[in-house]
Amino acid sequence: MKIVVIGGTGLIGSKTVAILRQSGHEVVAASPKSGVNTITGEGLKEALAGAQVVIDLANSPSFEDKAVLEFFQTSGRNLLAAETAASVRHHVALSIVAIDRTDNGYFRAKLAQEKLIEGIPYTIIRATQFMEFLRGIADSSADGNRVRLPPVLFQPIAADDIAPIVAEVALAAPRNGIVEIAGPERASFHEIVARYLKAIGDPREVVRDPEARYFGGRVEEHSLVPLSEARLGHISLDEWLRRSQAKA
């Protein structure tokens, strides 16, 4: 089976490509570096020729509200048009849990991307926040030597748990719906970030702040976790930290 992975050289993409190739599939790791650009359309027709499945893992180079919305809308339209022309049979998109319940620009852009998907059998995978992004989350919430976080629940998932699920979903029949995935541990946001910072030797204090926002958006207790049944990964935060430190 020919499978095209858009964003195939990124964090999740590279792992997904490796898994699918090990299973014997013909996999194209598509990215601007390989001559495939979903914004300009360059290389899409050639990359998608003969493909049965497309996995969209592309991410915006900018997180500014207007720029990220334009990226996902333009990329999504170009990619889906190319898939229609190539008679692709399954479109898989990686998205984010709670994007329809959280008010920030990036989440709004991902929701707009989801809404573009029509006319092609599809599966949307909504994941909770990646463990690999914990440092960025802490930095974005920093106020001097303190990290201010809203009093909400958090359930991050490791990239090594996400990629196998993405590969499995891509090889299965389209669901024409949404699959939610999350990490195995649910705890308070500040507790998880505090554990992470302590483990890496970061002395910043983590505090609960009801006025704190998440990347500019207000969140409530369950805004960042699945509300119903979700498929859970196996890698705990402690295990992920152990693996990360072993690689360092």
Each model region followed by its residue ranges:
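NAD(P)H-binding glycine-rich loop region in Rossmannoid oxidoreductase-like domains
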Residues: 22-86, 96-101
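A conserved pocket-lining segment of Rossmann-fold NAD(P)-dependent short-chain dehydrogenase/reductase
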Residues: 123-124, 136-157, 161
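N-terminal Rossmann NAD(P)H-binding glycine-rich loop of SDR-like oxidoreductase domains
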Residues: 1-23
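Conserved beta-loop-beta element that borders a ligand/cofactor-binding pocket
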Residues: 90, 95-100, 115-133
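Glycine/proline-rich active-site loop of Rossmann-fold NAD(P)-dependent oxidoreductases
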Residues: 132-143, 169-179, 185, 202-203
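Glycine-rich Rossmann NAD(P)(H)-binding loop
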Residues: 148-153, 179-186
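Non-catalytic, hydrophobic alpha-helical segments
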Residues: 12, 54, 162-166, 181, ...
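Mobile cap/lid helix-loop segments that border enzyme active or cofactor-binding sites
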Residues: 193-248
